[in-house]
Amino acid sequence: MASFHSHSPSPPAALSPDDAPQPRRPSRTSLHDAAAAAAPALSPESPGHELEDGADSSEFNADDVPVEVLVKHLLAAKQSLSSMTLVLRANDLATSARQMHQEFVILSAQTAFLRHGILQELHILHQLRRGMARAYDNGTRDFKHIIRTLDTADGRLEKIMQVLRKTTVENVFRQPGEEPKCLLDFVDPKIVEQVRDALKESIHELSAAKTSFDGDLLRFDTDLRTLTDAMAAAASLANPTTTTPDGYPPDQRSIPNLLSALSEGSHLMAEHLSSLTRHFDMCVTAVRTTEGGAALARRRAAEATSSDEDQAPVSISGVISAQESESGPSAFEPMDPLERQELLHVVMRDAAEVDDVVADIHNVLQQMEMDHASLHSLFSASRASHAATLTCFSMLEEVGARASSYVAAEAEFMQRWEDEKETIDENVSKMDELKKFYEGFLNAYGGLLLEVERRRAVEGKIDSIWRKAKEQVDKLVEADKREREHFRLEVGDYVPADLWGVVDRPLGRWAVVPLEDTREGSYEMEAHGEPENEGKVETAYERETEPSTPTPRKMPLNGPGSAGERPF
């Protein structure tokens, strides 16, 4: 059997024959150390009880113990039994701790299962978000590339249009009195504006699709961030904010230790109460075996109850009355002197430890209250974390319901993107075709200028040839004139007038005219004199209105079959 706690530095004697000598230890200060220390208890009365120290037993004299001292110890023992409420409280704490631990295990398992599932779903949602981000980034890169491509194509088109705008049409291609024009006046600018408007509309649609998808991504990010924060908050709730007496928050790993400490504390307090009960029984026996002890005990109990109102009432009448009724009318029962001496020796020795045992019960209960508070804090934190995790699960259901709309938004964004890209590619191709057409137009105009110059050169050569021919004809006409005059002088006096008519006919005049008259005058070659339009030879081609080259033909002004025709 164990003994009461004692603050005495020397070890006490054994309380029973079966007890081995044990040193007394200081009052218990922590339930966590209770498992390592033996629990003290009062020694029970035993008929064969042997004293721990023979010298002490021989020196002790039961007759020297006044009855007042025994009654005092009896009342103190009875008063110590009021700690039964503390023991009951300790039992309630231990029972509550076991119930909380059972519920804690269930809640922890459910929370861990829910949390694992939510984290897996959250990981899938993050993967979905990364896929949407890649689609958004690819679209953004394509958008920038499209803008650069459009700027380049529009810049090339605008450059060639500027060249057309700065290129003035030569006078030779304009009607008389017509205002100056540039090459851009010969093309339809509405086509370019239509292409540009179509491109602007496509860019606007791409921007709208990008903005709409960006809004969906922001809402998705908000959902993920809210769910992640809620999960972090739920995890943080599993760690209580309260602190233990040592200044540190309780840890879930300490729950087994707390349960063990509460169970050991409850068991230790029950042992203390059992020891106090045995000590009270021995005090009752000691008083009953002492002459006048029962009556004095009842009187002192009544006086103690009436004198101190703050103190709990002490009632021993039931115990003493029952013993007295069992023992008959006598107020005291004789007992073997040796047994009585041993009994009183144990009572006197244990009486000094009653206060220590009661104080130890209070200390143990105080520590149990703190341990129970720590365990309750962990349980409350676990319950709060479980409730928060359930809230996260509800949030996950809502996010999952909206996830389909986010996926649909991604598909819509990609479809709109592809459609508008196809439209933009078509319009860019149109811009390239317009650029090529305008370049061809500009090159054709340059070729047209070269063709005009070439034709001018050809007509100049033709003019030169006809001028030389005219000079030869003029020489022939002059020679013919002289020959005619010489012939007339030689034979004119001899030829009759009837025969002279054909010979006297003037030399025919010739002119070179184009099949299609593209000039204001023509070259006429007369046998008698200069050409009528000699001064207009150099300017005839400058008044050209058609780019075609005329095919000249030679025809007589007065040819055969004309009026006055006579054979030569």
From Swiss-Prot:
It comes from Neurospora crassa (strain ATCC 24698 / 74-OR23-1A / CBS 708.71 / DSM 1257 / FGSC 987). GO terms for biological process: autophagosome assembly; mitophagy; pexophagy; piecemeal microautophagy of the nucleus. This is Autophagy-related protein 17. GO terms for cellular component: Atg1/ULK1 kinase complex; phagophore assembly site; phagophore assembly site membrane. It comes from the Eukaryota. Autophagy-specific protein that functions in response to autophagy-inducing signals as a scaffold to recruit other ATG proteins to organize pre-autophagosomal structure (PAS) formation. Modulates the timing and magnitude of the autophagy response, such as the size of the sequestering vesicles. Plays particularly a role in pexophagy and nucleophagy. Residues 522-546 have a biased composition (Basic and acidic residues). Pfam families: ATG17_like. Its main location: cytoplasm. Disulfide bonds: none annotated. Keywords: Autophagy, Cytoplasm, Membrane. InterPro entries: Atg17, ATG17-like_dom. It is found in: Cytoplasm; Preautophagosomal structure membrane. Belongs to the ATG17 family. It is a peripheral membrane protein. Residues 1-59, 522-568 are annotated as: Disordered. GO terms for molecular function: molecular adaptor activity; protein kinase activator activity.
